[in-house]
Curated annotation (Swiss-Prot):
GO cellular component, one term: ribosome
The protein's name: Small ribosomal subunit protein uS11
Protein function: Located on the platform of the 30S subunit.
Keyword set includes rRNA-binding: yes
Amino acid sequence: MVFSAREIKWGVAHIYSSYNNTIIHITDLTGAETVARTSGGMVVKADREKPSPYAAMLAASRAAQQAMDRGIMALHIKVRAPGGHGPKTPGPGAQAAIRALARAGFIIGRIEDVTPLPHDTTRRPGGRRGRRV
């Protein structure tokens, strides 16, 4: 299929990937209008499977189908980890979600990491002597 640049409808895929879950949220370019929203917990039964790459892949393909039904043909991708004083690296589902969106037939524009990084952080929980286990 050949499209002119004017005909292609772009969207933004916000992928939040932690070590507990993966959330895929597809919006229009402004980010104001939600097109599709799914998570790893919506597609698997067991809680322990929520953060898995397989759950992220299923969630991404479900979100991709909903977005294509709404006419979106191309995506910019924003990947986010918990950040702040949590982990600064995305969880195991981020890579699988990006790959599933690409396989679904979208044109992929920019892939960007939007993890919030503190410039001078708030104090970590646990106190002066740390968490005593």
